[in-house]
Amino acid sequence: MHDKILILDFGSQVTQLIARRVREAHVYCEIHPNDVSDEFVREFAPKAVILSGSHASTYEDHQLRAPQAVWDLGVPVLGICYGMQTMAVQLGGKVEWSDHREFGYAEVRAHGHTRLLDGIEDFTTAEGHGMLKVWMSHGDKVAELPPGFKLMASTPSCPIAGMADEARGYYAVQFHPEVTHTVKGRQMLERFVLQIAGAKPDWIMRDHIEEAVAKIREQVGDEEVILGLSGGVDSSVAAALIHRAIGDQLTCVFVDHGLLRLNEGKMVLDMFEGRLHAKVVHIDASEQFLGHLAGVTDPEAKRKIIGREFVEVFQAEAKKLSNAKWLAQGTIYPDVIESGGAKTKKATTIKSHHNVGGLPETLGLKLLEPLRDLFKDEVRELGVALGLPPEMVYRHPFPGPGLGVRILGEVKREYADLLRRADAIFIEELRNTVATAQDAAAGLCGEADVGKSWYDLTSQAFAVFLPVKSVGVMGDGRTYDYVTALRAVQTTDFMTAHWAHLPYSLLGRVSNRIINEVRGINRAVYDISGKPPATIEWE
């Protein structure tokens, strides 16, 4: 049985980052709403509790509070931002409006010697004070410490930026250690979870396979399962895991909607039919999808059409498999959170996700989601442990609607063919080009990155088809052809992203190859927009 950390969500958009940091320390955790019952908290039996931030204020009429059981359990508790404020209020302290709100980078001074911050600092002042570079986002502040607490950190505008009652194992910080902007944040969370809470670091993906296989076998029994295989990381790992558990009881349905990457269908079939010997039904539905997309330019309308047609094609095939009782999906934890359907009802809906829908109800099937509690990095680890090739497992993210949302405006087969080839050239050059010492000296990458491919040094890279033409010259003749945009970003969590500073020589080579090898494109541009304000995908 794994030690568990209970994360109570008060509505922060970055609560899942807390969970990711805890999992990265190889400790299992779950996110639940802050208003779960005392009985639930006791039955969960956490090794420690973490209280998240929130957009709310402790002054609102319906203040969000932690269950009383949190304080009665006798386990360590860490409050983050709003979590610190509710800890203060519930334990006898005082919170008030702050005249100096803090949003963004801040430098926090550590006070005293606490187990949480001891020895953790980013720099030392001339006076010898240890300082931390952190990320703040708050409007209220703790004005009076609760009985038994001592000051742990401060800023000029927030005199109580951290507090601790070490006798009870209660710690709280006004900043966000879970975000990458807090330089030593991961170290703080690891110390709380591993040293203060004493949780065992035994949440390891290669060991998780045995548990997951046993759970799938227990759920499914001798019944059959159908799974929509997209070629993406999530559905591929789900298929490999389920096949490991039940073998030929699984049938994978691979729908080619005409909007896949170059040679993607062949790669998927070679992997699952050839290497894993799984049952795969391959359906070429490109004519159907492209026909319904004709004349449609609105991005959301395109997404809905692609989703609707996939359901229609998948349903038709599923009905032929009359013995199937389960529908398997590659849903992962962020999908569930972003769809507002996580174990926490406080999560704000960001977008509708293509994996979370009504298919099980319309088909009358039970739902099997073996990756539902895993983050993307854990899914990748699991895939490698299952024997999937790294080039499949560590592929960059690809949207559910495929190239349909990387072709701006109307989708046509001609556009998809041009984009497929341009994108393949971009990815090939990224894979084949390694970072050099000169790149590091120019500040394009770190010294530790020298020798790594630029594909591995970017988090997501792709080409976009622009439905506009520009004038060019090739040979002695005038051309009037389409434009492609190249997009490459670097990010740790995909919530924010920086555009990748690729070497000019690499970009020049990609542009030259696309213009010379893809007849119909005569210009390539590079997108240098960050997120925010831009999103990573163009549509």
UniProtKB/Swiss-Prot annotation:
Keywords: ATP-binding, Glutamine amidotransferase, GMP biosynthesis, Ligase, Nucleotide-binding, Purine biosynthesis
Domain called Glutamine amidotransferase type-1: residue spans: 4-202
Active-site residues, Swiss-Prot/TrEMBL: 81, 176, 178
EC number: 6.3.5.2
InterPro entries in UniProt: Class_I_gatase-like, GATASE, GMP_synth_C, GMP_synth_GATase, GMP_synthase, GMPS_ATP_PPase_dom, NAD/GMP_synthase, Rossmann-like_a/b/a_fold
Catalyzed reactions: XMP + L-glutamine + ATP + H2O = GMP + L-glutamate + AMP + diphosphate + 2 H(+)
Keyword Transport annotated: no
GO terms for cellular component: cytosol
SUPFAM superfamilies, per the entry: Adenine nucleotide alpha hydrolases-like, Class I glutamine amidotransferase-like, GMP synthetase C-terminal dimerisation domain
Domain GMPS ATP-PPase: 203-395
GO molecular function: ATP binding; GMP synthase activity
Pathway: Purine metabolism; GMP biosynthesis; GMP from XMP (L-Gln route): step 1/1
Residues annotated for ATP binding in this entry: 230-236
Disulfide bonds: none
Signal peptide residue numbers: none
Function: Catalyzes the synthesis of GMP from XMP.
Subunit description: Homodimer.
Protein name: GMP synthase [glutamine-hydrolyzing]
The encoding gene: guaA
